[in-house]
C-alpha cells in the first residue's frame, strides 16, 4: 500500500492491475463501504471484467463464505467463467443456465460465484431473491434500461450488500436509459420517473 493506493491489489488476483484499473477497483470498494452501487462504464477492452473480479477477490479475502451473483447476457456466461478461472482460480463458479439447474446445491455448497443470464434470472427469480448476496454484478446493464420490463423488475428484487453495473453503453437512446440502471444501484436517489425526465 502506497500513498496513491487506498487499497492494495488483492493477493489472490492473478493479474497486475494498470493504474486506472486500480482506481476503478478502489472506487468500487469505497462506494460499497457507503452502501452505494457503482456503475463502471469504461469502453470495451479497458478491463471492466478484471476490475470487477478484483473487487470480488477483495470481498472474498475479507469473508471466505461470501456469495456473489453475476448476471449477464447468456452469450457472455462462459466468457465470465474463463476470466474467473484465469484471474481468480480460487473462486469456485456455478453456472445457473440451461437444463439441470440446481440453485439449492449452489447455496448449500462452498461455491462462491453464481453466473446466470438475464432470462434465466427472470424465470427463476423466486430462488434468486431469497439470498442476501455479498455482491450482485450486472454485465451489459443496459439490459435493464426498460423500467417496466419483467427482467428489470426481477433484477430489482435481488438483495445484496454491494451492487455493480457494467456497461460500455449505459445510454443507448437517451438519458432516461440510465434511470433504471441507477435506480438499481441507488434506489430512489434520482426521484420518480417524471421528476427525472
What role is predicted for each listed range?
Residues 2-197:
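ASCE P-loop NTPase motor core, strongest for the SF2 helicase catalytic module
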Amino acid at each position: 500500500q502506497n500513498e496513491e493506493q487506498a487499497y492494495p491489489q488483492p493477493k489472490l488476483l492473478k493479474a497486475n492491475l494498470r493504474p486506472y484499473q486500480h482506481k476503478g477497483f478502489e472506487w468500487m470498494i469505497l462506494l460499497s463501504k457507503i452502501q452505494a452501487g457503482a456503475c463502471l462504464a469504461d469502453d470495451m477492452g479497458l478491463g471492466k471484467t478484471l476490475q470487477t473480479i478484483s473487487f470480488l477477490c477483495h470481498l472474498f479475502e475479507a469473508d471466505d463464505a461470501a456469495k456473489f451473483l453475476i448476471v449477464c447476457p447468456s452469450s457472455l456466461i462462459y466468457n465470465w467463467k474463463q476470466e474467473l478461472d484465469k484471474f481468480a482460480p480460487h473462486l469456485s463458479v456455478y453456472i445457473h443456465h440451461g437444463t439441470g439447474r440446481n440453485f439449492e446445491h449452489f447455496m448449500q455448497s462452498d461455491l462462491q460465484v453464481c453466473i446466470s443470464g438475464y432470462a434465466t434470472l427472470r424465470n427463476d427469480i423466486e430462488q434468486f431473491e431469497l439470498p442476501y448476496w455479498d455482491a450482485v454484478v450486472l454485465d451489459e446493464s443496459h439490459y435493464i434500461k426498460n423500467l417496466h420490463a419483467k427482467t428489470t423488475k426481477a433484477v430489482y428484487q435481488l438483495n445484496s450488500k454491494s451492487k455493480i453495473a457494467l456497461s460500455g453503453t449505459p445510454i443507448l437512446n437517451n438519458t432516461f436509459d440510465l434511470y433504471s440502471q441507477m435506480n438499481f444501484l441507488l434506489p430512489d436517489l434520482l426521484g420518480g420517473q417524471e421528476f427525472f425526465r
